[in-house]
């Protein structure tokens, strides 16, 4: 029985819709002309932000990607789109400590990421998904618990 786990042999090819492609293009143009700059997408629900963000990351060859959300429940949609449209063959590994993703076959915790990167000849790129609730509980972000220290040590 599958029990809701995403299982695919290979990533699915996709084509962004016109408004998604325009958003990715505009963001990439801004990114390239404003090193260290910030860009905010104010997109309607069902726009396809997840796939658009993943496409942008691939286009600019982002090495470390941090996805922070105030809704841990959406972790499953970020994860399932990663499996469907990127997968490990993209060169990205999906890293998360969010409880909703525990035990999923393509999700690594920080140590799992380090182990996977150490086994390959190349350093894998990473997409890390965290919730604000987890960050708030971390002593590195004003909380009490010794967790998520690595988030402060990476160049996002």
Question: Residues of each region from the PLM?
Answer:
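SF2 helicase/translocase NTPase motor core
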Residues: 1-156
């Amino acid at each position: 029985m599958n029990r809701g786990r995403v299982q695919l042999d290979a990533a699915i090819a996709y084509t962004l819709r016109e408004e998604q492609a325009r958003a990715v293009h505009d963001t990439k143009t801004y990114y390239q002309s404003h090193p260290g700059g910030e860009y905010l997408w104010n997109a309607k629900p069902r726009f396809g932000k997840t796939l658009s963000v993943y496409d942008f990351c691939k286009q600019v060859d982002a090495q470390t990607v941090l996805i922070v959300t105030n809704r841990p429940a959406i972790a499953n949609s970020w994860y399932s789109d990663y499996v469907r449209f990127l997968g490990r063959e993209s060169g990205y590994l999906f890293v998360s400590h969010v409880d909703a993703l525990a035990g999923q076959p393509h999700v690594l915790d920080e140590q799992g990421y380090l182990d996977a990167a150490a086994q390959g000849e190349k350093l894998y790129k990473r997409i890390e998904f965290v919730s604000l609730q987890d960050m708030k509980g971390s002593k590195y972000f004003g909380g009490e618990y010794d967790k998520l220290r690595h988030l402060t040590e990476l160049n996002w």
